[in-house]
A protein has these predicted regions:
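An N-terminal hydrophobic leader/cap segment in hydrolases
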Residues: 11-81
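Serine-hydrolase catalytic core
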Residues: 68-69, 75, 79-83, 89-90, ...
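Short beta-strand element of the alpha/beta-hydrolase
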Residues: 100-108
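The serine-hydrolase catalytic nucleophile loop
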Residues: 109-123, 136
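Conserved alpha/beta-hydrolase
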Residues: 124-143
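Alpha/beta-hydrolase active-site loop
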Residues: 147-168
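Alpha/beta-hydrolase fold nucleophile elbow
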Residues: 168-180
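Hydrolase active-site cap/lid region
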Residues: 188-252
Length: 253
């Protein structure tokens, strides 16, 4: 009996230690994922590519860097709106003479408008598109403590679409465009009461839900289990955003 009790206590202690470790690791990863200022962990060399699973291409990156510099420096109007929850959100308006359409562009996770759209901005300009490049909440000059992975940004997308129609009218068709998390943002906004002038959505490399992308990163990129970690991540998400990580999906929208 004493031996059995000892084995049981040892097993329970090991399980508790394992659970505590998963809890701690998950909280750190959620800070990396959601915080405006990520922990030092993400700033270490190679950590970002490990999280995203991206394989760097130096030639492509060099071209993107130069195009990003040119886009950021190009003359344009800095604009702003207030989100539904009272945050100051920044945007960059690039009008096109004799425009045929308007694009509202949303960048991705821990990125920037002039980086994600650097290499396509020239094409949009040549195709006579006026473009509003949005700075997503909790990034760059937009307020907010937490990145919402589309759960909160979808409402910001609606607000920006309404701002465009209020300022410029509804004569031109509006297209919502997004890359990565920005792609998820515009897709999740599809079931909201968007202005009738919104005629289409362009989404590149979007994921289906925060829960799905966190599970993918944990299993495929970091090679760690997600059963208990997923439950903890959802609790953190609910506490910070007041919405569950799987309550909205691009497939449902």
């Amino acid at each position: 009996m004493k031996k059995a009790a000892k084995i049981t206590i040892t097993a329970l202690s090991a399980a508790a230690a394992c659970g505590a470790a998963i809890y701690g690791v998950t909280h750190v990863l959620m800070d990396v994922a959601m915080n405006r200022q990520p922990p030092r962990l993400r700033k270490k060399k190679g950590s970002a590519s490990r999280l995203t699973g991206e394989t760097p291409n130096e030639g492509f990156r060099a071209a993107q860097k130069e195009a990003s510099r040119q886009l950021a420096a190009a003359p344009h109007e800095v604009v702003a709106i207030q989100s539904r929850d009272g945050l100051h959100l920044a945007g960059h308006w690039f009008p096109c003479p004799d425009a045929e359409r308007i694009i509202i562009a949303f960048h991705g996770w821990h990125s920037a408008w002039h980086w994600d759209f650097a290499l396509i901005s020239g094409f949009w300009r040549r195709e006579r598109c006026s473009v509003l490049y949005v700075e997503q909440r909790a990034q760059q000059n937009s307020e907010g403590d937490y990145i919402g992975f589309g759960l909160t940004e979808r409402e910001d997308c609606l607000a920006w679409a309404r701002w465009v129609t209020e300022r410029f009218g509804t004569a031109l068709p509006i297209y919502l465009a997004g890359v990565s998390m920005g792609g998820t943002t515009v897709l999740m906004a599809a079931d909201l009461p968007l202005p009738e002038a919104v005629r289409g959505i362009i989404a590149d490399s979007a994921y289906t839900s925060p829960h799905a992308i966190w599970q993918h990163v944990a299993r495929k990129n970091l090679h760690i289990p997600f059963v208990l970690g997923g439950w903890i991540a959802d609790r953190v998400c609910r506490r910070r955003l007041s919405v569950g990580s799987d309550e909205c999906s691009t497939l449902d929208s």
